[in-house]
Amino acid sequence: MLSLHPDIIIQQFVTMKKNLLMAVLGLISIGAQAQDTKPAIPRDAALEAKIEKTLSRMTLDEKIGQMLELNLDVMGKMTVENAKVDREKVRSVLQQYGAPPKETEALLKMTDQQIIDRLSNYPVDIYQGETRRVWQLNETMLDTLISKWKVGSILNAPGTRAATVDQWQQWIRLIQKKSMKYIGIPDIYGLDHNHGVTYTQGGTLFPQPINLGASFNTELARTGAEITAYESRAANCPWVYNPVVDLSRDPRWPRVWESFGEDPIVNAKMVVAEIQGYQGDDPNHIDRFHVGTSTKHYFAYGAPWTGKDRTPAYLSPQMIREKYFEPFKQAALAGTLTMMVNSASVNGVPLHASYEYLTKWLKEDLQWDGFLVTDWADINNLFTREKVAKDKKDAIRIAINAGIDMSMDPYSVEFCILLKELVNEGQVKMERIDDAVRRILRAKYRLGLFDEPNTGGKGYEKFGSDEFAKASLQTAEESEILLKNEGILPLAKGQKILLTGPNANQMRCLHGGWSYTWQGSRAEDLSEKYNTIYEALCNKYGEENIILEQGVTYNEDGAYYAEHAPEIDKAVAAADKADVIIACIGENSYTETPGNLTDLWLSENQRNLVKALYKTGKPIILVLNEGRPRLIADIEPLATAVVDILIPGNYGGDALANLLAGDANFSGKLPYTYPREINSLNTYDYKVSEEVGTMAGAYNYDAKVSLQWPFGYGLSYTTFEYSNLKTDKTHFTADDIITVTVDVKNTGKTAGKEAVLLYSSDLVASIVPDNRRLRDFTKIELQPGETKTVTFLLPAKDLAFVGADGRWTLEEGDFILKVGKRTVSIVCDATKVWDTPNI
């Protein structure tokens, strides 16, 4: 970080330069023409004229300033009242976030005030006793940053902790006032409102995106996005860093729960629904009740070779084009206003340095005219971590020329200085600067910020309303998954229930990361009005019938996986008074690098708790509350029922109580493959040749992939029968639309919803085909005895694959379509090979 005039960089951040904690505590906020492709969003001539007029009057300094995004923390200071540092807590925090021992010891030798100055802006507990954190905006600093450096975007919540609507109104209105005064261009303020207004107190939090994937209901995705947009605008925030469509195909990755699961079609359909909900029906004219989206993280961020956050991916060209690119392509075509870029590399190329992926694939091939923003300080990573640039200036040159339009450089204006040097030296052309700024201005005009820089106040009376709460509850009910039921559910009232496990009585586990704070920790005071699982079950079954003895609890002063010494004997003793045991197990909240793990197995303490309770002879219902599928193969056989609630949000406990009691019916299905063992982490669309198992000789071609439960699996209190699977044609060619119909009947005695999934299999291909691929899905509701006919319109080109030559190919031959257990065969009569990158 360059040392500038003191009114530019707060001294605490200059000192923090050498402290690697800043890096490990980083936040996710997260074009020319080619082909005869129409723009993803049809251009509005009047709006484009305004963009050109504004661009024509801007100086180089103003243009470069628009390309910089700063963290709000740099414009103020966090004061911690009654602060006395607990050095053991400081040591624990530094160790948790990976600070080197040498840096840790150096910090511990500093005075209390020096430690507070360096760490007070972060949502970590390093204090003795009770404290109160107060953040104040420095108007002089804000003046300088906007008047001198022309900063065009600001992000984040102070200390990454949710603020009130009134605070957001005060801060953003002042920012907009300064922006319009000094440069005549409004700021575009961004927040990680990922599953509701996560950084705004009193708003509506929804289940995490992985739950939306489990619901298989795109209408829920759109509704949740509409509500989040409304409540974001109530807080005066016009831009959200969402949706997330990183395919979660490695269960070790700490951000599995932030996407819609492992399948590209689920992610693609959900992202389109969310973009429509967030932005409304006209992305050229987004009204005051909708927001701009930043679809992220473009792309393959969720495929780290090591399973660790922000580490390299190594993928075949076919896998990239067919699967990892697909949701982002659909997001671009749906008009997402912006995209955020993957922090890591793919096949040795950092995404922030890839002209092919950033400019050619997105801006040229798709004619997408939004802007690309980096993730947290990721241009710096090109020289500090990826080693493809010699210094920061070189990294800026590489990234901007590759296609990056806005740099999230949280604590420094050095970007502006170095980029100006690059332009003056001819290393970055003025045409590239103009292209980037034009895209940023386009987003601001589309959001209506020039005409109405601020929103909120009158017209936003539904903020945090019961109406919105009901939508969140419905999403939770439709996304919690019944994985096993040996006749114990619905659970009759009047029984004594032992409620145990570390997730039984904590809101943090239910709302997950990006909830009030970055890690979702130390925010219990902001979620007190919602019900934990314990409180929800007390409301449903009567407090006198619920015995709470957790046996294992989380250590809130440690890492997300830290647990106190177990007290399993107490839980076993309490089981004597119970008729049934509900064990709430899983994970505490986390996100990003702090959520890395070294062992996919559920913690030994929790598994030992279940094993000990099994010996009591009382039936056990396992409730899994987790952001990724932790291995439970040794305890699943001990359970009479298993429910996976994933991360269901503030109404997840209420939803679970309704479902366990039979007042609502399960309809969720797994959005990922649940593995049984660490050496079998296949996804559902594995190659047939990947099937492995116990060898019955030299080879066993009848072996299957080892898994706990398959993708798309989920039970209900009723049963559904599929019949009459038909297609309107048995032979087809590439330009055909295949109409697929199937009858679905509710054959049980309870009303229920069913996600209907359409799969295809290519029986023989010139490269090894996937064993099956999801092609479409929908969700229906059926009364007992009711039958509905479901219709899918399947474009034949969707059955194509990327061949060895990199071209889309549909080969003649046999295909099988499957819905439920029903199959139908169809035949492609002619091979077609496309010369275009997208079909």
Predicted regions and their residues:
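Short proline/glycine-enriched turn/loop segments at secondary-structure junctions
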Residues: 805-807
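Short beta-strand elements
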Residues: 823-838
